[in-house]
């Protein structure tokens, strides 16, 4: 299911997460990687490695709604950032194009209630985008 959400966004051009002039689409020449919008990279403060979290499919952070494609360059650039630094790096154009509105301001990744609330809001936005696209396709 993660791949379907990523592919839905990939079906139309969107700006890279942190660099506006890096456009991502199906024809991107840069290597693309799946990326957690709420990243796993700063998990040391809850005693779990990012590899452990990645493998825990029941963890809320592995929700399909928490994935997008970014360039490998961007993935490397943000991987070592704290959550607060990472949140500041996301450009407005990417937030709008990828339905990353009201990004959850969390101190650490154990704040599951805030993350869940944000994922539910993103679900509503993504669902609306899909319905709009399907309606447009059916009416043409």
What are these regions (language model features)?
Residues 1-37, 41-42:
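Aromatic-lined ligand-binding clefts that engage carbohydrates, nucleic acids, or primary amines
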Residues 2-3, 65-68, 124:
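Non-catalytic, well-ordered alpha-helical scaffold segments
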Residues 25-65:
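Histidine-centered nuclease catalytic patch
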Residues 35-38, 68, 72-75, 127:
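Generic hydrophobic alpha-helical scaffold/packing signal
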Residues 38, 47, 65-68, 96-107:
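Short acidic (Asp/Glu) and glycine-rich catalytic loops that position anionic groups and cofactors
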Residues 43-46, 78-85, 110, 138:
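Short conserved micro-motifs at the rims of enzyme active sites and ligand-binding pockets
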Residues 60-92:
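Short Cys/His-centered divalent metal-binding micro-motifs
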Residues 95-140:
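C-terminal, well-folded lobe of enzymatic/effector domains
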């Amino acid at each position: 299911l993660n791949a379907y959400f990523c592919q839905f966004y990939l079906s139309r051009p969107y700006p890279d997460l942190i660099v506006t002039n890096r456009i991502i689409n199906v024809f991107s020449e840069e290597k693309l990687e799946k990326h957690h919008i709420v990243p796993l990279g700063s998990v040391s403060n809850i005693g779990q490695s990012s590899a452990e979290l990645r493998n825990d499919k029941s963890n809320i952070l592995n929700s399909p709604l928490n994935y997008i494609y970014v360039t490998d360059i961007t993935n490397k650039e943000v991987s070592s950032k704290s959550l607060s630094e990472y949140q500041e790096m996301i450009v407005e154009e990417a937030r709008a194009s990828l339905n990353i509105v009201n990004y959850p301001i969390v101190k650490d990744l154990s704040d599951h209630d805030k993350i869940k609330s944000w994922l539910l809001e993103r679900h509503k936005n993504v669902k609306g985008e899909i319905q709009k696209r399907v309606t447009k396709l059916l009416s043409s």
